[in-house]
Amino acid sequence: MPQNGQIRYHCRMTMSDRSSTGGFDPSGIDEEAWTELERQLEATIPVYDKVNKIMTLGFDKGMRKHVRSHAKEGMKVLEVGCGPGSFAVGIEGVELTCLDPSAEMLKVCKKRLDLVREERGENPAKYVEAIAEEIPLPDNTFDRVFCLFSFRDFKDKKKGLSEIFRVLKPGGQLVICDAGKANWLHGIFGRIYMGTFVQLVARIVTKDPNHPWKWLARTYTHYGTHSYYKKLMREVGYTGVKARLLFPGMSSRFKAMKPEQ
């Protein structure tokens, strides 16, 4: 039952054979690996924004601003994988729903976001504890769905994309911003960056040699390329699918539309 404006919903996904890659591949993540991933993500909460700012060389703010520009006043907006609310606090003038599988992330997000929206004279956001693959919300509800550095954490990316397609209104748009991997060559440079600079930054900030980013680097290693996910989106039914790197090349932005009926 909903509590404090928050809906909780979870399901168990079917495991596939990814034993040689520790439970990861471009299409998704096995249950055991995903459960550990969520635990590691929750461990990032105290330093989430600080580490992300340093590891993106300060471009995280601009990336979020770029994605927010796709939301117009009065729209119904869903953020899938809202985390601690770093993106959501900057969206103004919309009817906002924040979804995340982590109760701890939603707790932090709600505390930050409710205060900001109250100060702006806006209605409170809605909060849903659920996975992207099973969104407990009606069909054809949202004008925009945003995924900010959460898409690579989906258990089943095609199913997640299908659920987002379902809850989008006809003519609605999905915008994803996540790790940059334009092609396999670009991915090699990304792995080096994630395996050296990001690890060093995380260790300094957290003062912990076993910091969560050491484990989270796996999500990038097994993340797919632009062409892989563009194909997946078209298979689901999206049109106008586009992907491009965002300066300075550490992140990618995908855009895709649900066709008008």
Predicted segments with their positions:
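Core SAM-dependent methyltransferase catalytic element
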Residues: 230, 236-261
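A short glycine-rich, Lys/Arg-flanked "PGG" loop and its adjoining helix->strand segment in the class I
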Residues: 158-173
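A short acidic, Gly/Pro-enriched loop at the edge of an enzyme's catalytic core
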Residues: 133-145
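Class I SAM-dependent methyltransferase SAM/SAH-binding core
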Residues: 78-134
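Conserved alpha-helix/loop element of class I SAM-dependent methyltransferases that forms part
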Residues: 56-74
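C-terminal alpha-helical "lid/dimerization" subdomain adjacent to the S-adenosyl-L-methionine
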Residues: 28-36, 177-235, 242
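N-terminal, positively charged/glycine-rich alpha-helical extensions of SAM-dependent methyltransferases
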Residues: 11-47
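A short SAM/SAH-binding and catalytic strip from SAM-dependent methyltransferases
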Residues: 144-156
